[in-house]
């Protein structure tokens, strides 16, 4: 596995001198196909798109596109494609900076928090979390 910052291998990535990762490459094992994700950011260093390469050729297996953000920098939308077709169209809702709703186009999921700001309900994964007096997870 390797990460590229300043000198990306693929032209879809621009060199970044901000510390942003421009490419992530990996192989599942020796002699396996090289997979690479190339990342694109906006002027505020927020991820806007990804592109996938397999053995140097552009692939559209799994790609994130059209990320948008609110004024606080929270993700508002994210589209995920699989083999070129829209697979998930996520929309995120917040109260302040706490995620309260997530919609994937098929269903809406609710998130809840206790008065200390700890997430107590993850609607998408069906998790309920209980915290102790020290704000440490006690039960999931």
Question: What are these language model-derived features?
Answer:
Residues 1-140:
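Acidic/glycine-rich beta-solenoid
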């Amino acid at each position: 596995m390797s990460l590229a910052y300043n000198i990306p291998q693929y032209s879809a990535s621009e060199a970044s001198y901000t510390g942003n990762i421009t490419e992530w490459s990996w192989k599942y094992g020796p002699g396996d196909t090289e997979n690479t994700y190339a990342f694109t950011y906006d002027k505020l260093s927020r991820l806007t798109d990804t592109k996938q390469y397999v053995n140097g050729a552009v692939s559209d297996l799994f790609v994130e596109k059209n990320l948008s953000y609110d004024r606080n920098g929270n993700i508002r939308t994210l589209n995920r494609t699989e083999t070129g077709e829209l697979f998930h169209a996520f929309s995120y809702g917040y109260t302040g900076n706490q995620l309260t709703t997530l919609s994937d186009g098929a269903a809406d999921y609710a998130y809840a928090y206790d008065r200390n700001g700890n997430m107590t309900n993850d609607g998408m994964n069906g998790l309920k979390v209980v915290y102790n007096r020290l704000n440490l997870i006690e039960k999931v």
